[in-house]
Amino acid sequence: MKGFFYFDLYFSGMSVATSKTFFSAFLKTLGLLWGFILTGLFLDSNLMQQWIAEPQWIANSVMFIGFFLCFKNVTLRIKEQMITAVIIAVLGEYLFSIALGMYTYRLENVPHYVPPGHALVYVGVLYFTKTAFTKLNRRLLEKIFTIIVLVYAVVFLIFENDIFGFLMTTLTLLVLRKRPRERLFYLSMYLTVAYLEIVGTNFFCWEWPSSAFNVFSFLPSANPPSGISFFYFGLDLGCLWLYKKRHKIAWNRMKNQRMIMLKSS
């Protein structure tokens, strides 16, 4: 776990940044993240309650350890974005879960492992999109991931009457049509969130009501809804917006460098 998503460290003998096969790129970023998600949510699951009366403190402890290992190994820029992600996630979780009742956690609280978990999801997806393999095969991955997203949303619509999730998926894909530079990042985020939600709801860590926000009966929802990553995008955009505001000069310099590269290509 010491090499969490860090370009300059080596995991299995290869740098994450230079991973040139899908297996290598996935294993060292999303694979590691998905495995950590599975482990952490299992520790807060109904299965763990068969052995420990209240296991959530264990899940919290494991998350804080994982967050620390990741945080100390990433760049200063990513450190800042991780802190921002945690702050935005705290506000978002209390707004959507506690205030609006969009979903409900097992103990009707916001578990301490959730906000830092948002930050790890952000970092894991970000580094997957920065690997050598994804850079070389970006368009192919975008097509494959889009097909998977569509199939996933349609299956939930047909078999779970997930109109709310399908609507969120449709909005996501429409937004991504005009954001080609971020498309692979958000498609990867969609799939990661779908995995996270399936694991979390099947472990009874949280649940979603049968309609959107448990209010809009004309928007039936599955548990979980398929396209809920649409709301995760607010976290990512918030991190990016705050970073740009704090580092205007560096951000403008990076934009100018991109324009030069595009003109010369």
Regions found by a protein language model. Name each.
Residues 7-265:
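Aromatic-rich, lipid-facing transmembrane alpha helices and their immediate juxtamembrane interface loops
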